[in-house]
């Protein structure tokens, strides 16, 4: 009943509707502009051959749901709480790193923007600043799923949170490898976080979450197979920053292991693939991240996105049961 109550609250419904409408309006404006600026995606040659035909598809489309979410936030919440603003800073801050990465790829005309070292340094700097700023409001404790308890990280909180942000943002980035995949999964993740935020009394934070979910639903119209636009690192890092910060504010970073199970699986598949090849010279998967493995098995992009979304729904219910 609490879940239903949160979803029929007029403010929540309006936030979803407004962000959906704003993103739907921005899409047909921003996508042609990206075409005109020749902000086309460069495709990795070592990736699936079926993806080569996607070369030139506009990227940096994450600006659509970033702007839509920001506009909706300030329309619905004239004076957002500090917690909601911290989530917004994380959303925009990590998105800015992604924007720099995308811009360099476009300038270089190849799928190489910031080096992995440069990107990691920027992610750690932003996460360090945000965590230091946020912990004054949220403390240093985190909840343990299923155990109904907390653990206080004390002095380890800030360094642990910094690497947590780097991990989550990179995980969402890895998930953004198929048309509509990261978008579909993150709609579900942000909806879950919005419901929990509402039920815990964080109304401004809940509005941020559902505004992002509504904007992503609209973006999915342009990003689903065959994609008319890609979110780029601009979008994927922004999404990672948003879900990571909201979960941290709620003292539930560990819950992302459940609701973000696809992010976890995608990341583990890459780690296992690299480790196996270096240690044995053999690959576990036909290609990593794992969504490409299923492509190589003959699954369509639409089927993979559907199955991964269903898995996310199942694990969201498991996460509800753990609270």
UniProtKB/Swiss-Prot annotation:
It is found in: Cell membrane. The chain crosses the membrane at residues 12-32, 58-78, 84-104, 120-140, 151-171, 177-197, 200-220, 229-250, 303-323. Pfam families: Glycos_transf_4 (PF00953). One of its GO terms (biological process) is cell division. CDD domains: GT_MraY. Its EC number is 2.7.8.13. Pathway: Cell wall biogenesis; peptidoglycan biosynthesis. InterPro entries: Glycosyl_transferase_4 (IPR000715), PNAcMuramoyl-5peptid_Trfase (IPR003524), PNAcMuramoyl-5peptid_Trfase_CS (IPR018480). One of its GO terms (molecular function) is phospho-N-acetylmuramoyl-pentapeptide-transferase activity. GO terms for cellular component: plasma membrane. It comes from the Bacteria. Keywords: Cell cycle, Cell division, Cell membrane, Cell shape, Cell wall biogenesis/degradation, Magnesium, Membrane, Metal-binding, Peptidoglycan synthesis, Transferase, Transmembrane, Transmembrane helix. Its main location: membrane. It catalyses: UDP-N-acetyl-alpha-D-muramoyl-L-alanyl-gamma-D-glutamyl-meso-2,6-diaminopimeloyl-D-alanyl-D-alanine + di-trans,octa-cis-undecaprenyl phosphate = di-trans,octa-cis-undecaprenyl diphospho-N-acetyl-alpha-D-muramoyl-L-alanyl-D-glutamyl-meso-2,6-diaminopimeloyl-D-alanyl-D-alanine + UMP. The keyword Metal-binding applies. Belongs to the glycosyltransferase 4 family. MraY subfamily. NCBIfam families: mraY (TIGR00445). Catalyzes the initial step of the lipid cycle reactions in the biosynthesis of the cell wall peptidoglycan: transfers peptidoglycan precursor phospho-MurNAc-pentapeptide from UDP-MurNAc-pentapeptide onto the lipid carrier undecaprenyl phosphate, yielding undecaprenyl-pyrophosphoryl-MurNAc-pentapeptide, known as lipid I. PANTHER family: PHOSPHO-N-ACETYLMURAMOYL-PENTAPEPTIDE-TRANSFERASE, PHOSPHO-N-ACETYLMURAMOYL-PENTAPEPTIDE-TRANSFERASE HOMOLOG. This is Phospho-N-acetylmuramoyl-pentapeptide-transferase. It comes from Clostridium perfringens (strain SM101 / Type A). The gene is mraY.
